[in-house]
Amino acid sequence: MSTQNTNAQNLSFVLEGIHRVKFEDRPIPEINNPHDVLVNVRFTGICGSDVHYWEHGSIGQFIVKDPMVLGHESSGVVSKVGSAVTSLKVGDCVAMEPGIPCRRCEPCKAGKYNLCVKMAFAATPPYDGTLAKYYVLPEDFCYKLPESITLQEGAIMEPLSVAVHIVKQAGINPGQSVVVFGAGPVGLLCCAVAKAYGASKVIAVDIQKGRLDFAKKYAATATFEPAKAAALENAQRIITENDLGSGADVAIDASGAEPSVHTGIHVLRAGGTYVQGGMGRSEITFPIMAACTKELNVKGSFRYGSGDYKLAVSLVSAGKVNVKELITGVVKFEDAERAFEEVRAGKGIKTLIAGVDS
């Protein structure tokens, strides 16, 4: 990998190919829309999708054909504002929502801009990501952070917004029981948001004991490590061990693993709600008999939509969700590749990359 240029104007962390990255000085992006702002990126979290592009060069139909800046979980400081910007000023600390919709297509007009057919999402080919010194966004996709939220915490607003959207899809009500499959960052945040919504029982499920130990200390009321058994058997154990009666009210999969999907369907009571938030193989088997005979509400969840980022910031500022505990490492910008290696190795919960030193 090429070394960092300390005199660069807009140093960027660029993926050239599988396991091939470099530091590259790129032009400082221009503000071409009067409603846009230029943000000096200060912290960026590493997402599983970033690591997947680094390891494989593609995710499904999204293939890295040209050099691409990685990163999309970011926070920063407003460096410059367009002439029509009214809600932000230079020096404001912001959480950065990294997907810009067209605002004109049918999903956008229906209020579901996360499903925009022309979405320009950071670090999704062909669009560059936020692991650069500067990045331009519309002002309404930058969320001013209150003084109670640090810039490090601000970078976690992205995965927290994913969790917020999943929980909103689930329609969780106070007193309900929720089983969350996958105790990675998004799964852990789903546990926290579910509790904030009033869930009385939140059971985290994972195959890694270390993650379950963290989940229990963080937000889960109970944990479950699946045995090498049939999904129906594991589901019954979850129900019995947690006194869930005829089954859980809500099951959320944040893993994308086929056994978790099966167990999630079987762990639900009749009329329960299942939300698929994790992505795995494009096609898997599915227990349609259980889904039909229990008349389950089965939903997907993709990224985040209208109001999700704002709610994420509110949950943290109100003290209802703690994201600071998830940050287990911060590395300098010049050590970005090492951070990717650590995430691939499963070290820590959430690693942040600090912004380029001025």
Swiss-Prot record:
Entries under InterPro entries matching the protein: ADH-like_C (IPR013149), ADH-like_N (IPR013154), ADH_Zn_CS (IPR002328), GroES-like_sf (IPR011032), NAD(P)-bd_dom_sf (IPR036291), PKS_ER (IPR020843), SDH-like (IPR045306)
Keywords carried by this UniProt record: Carbohydrate metabolism, Metal-binding, NAD, Oxidoreductase, Xylose metabolism, Zinc
Cofactor note: Binds 1 zinc ion per subunit.
Cofactor entry: Zn(2+)
EC number: 1.1.1.9
Pathway: Carbohydrate degradation; L-arabinose degradation via L-arabinitol; D-xylulose 5-phosphate from L-arabinose (fungal route): step 4/5
Residues holding NAD(+): 182-187
Catalytically driven reaction(s): xylitol + NAD(+) = D-xylulose + NADH + H(+)
UniProt-listed GO biological process terms: D-xylose metabolic process; L-arabinose catabolic process to xylulose 5-phosphate; sorbitol catabolic process
Binding site for Zn(2+): 47, 72-73
GO molecular function, one term: D-xylulose reductase activity
Pfam families: ADH_N (PF08240), ADH_zinc_N (PF00107)
Protein's job: Xylitol dehydrogenase which catalyzes the conversion of xylitol to D-xylulose. Xylose is a major component of hemicelluloses such as xylan. Most fungi utilize D-xylose via three enzymatic reactions, xylose reductase (XR), xylitol dehydrogenase (XDH), and xylulokinase, to form xylulose 5-phosphate, which enters pentose phosphate pathway.
PANTHER family xrefs: SORBITOL DEHYDROGENASE
Family listed: Belongs to the zinc-containing alcohol dehydrogenase family.
Protein name (Swiss-Prot/TrEMBL): Probable D-xylulose reductase A
Gene name, Swiss-Prot/TrEMBL: xdhA
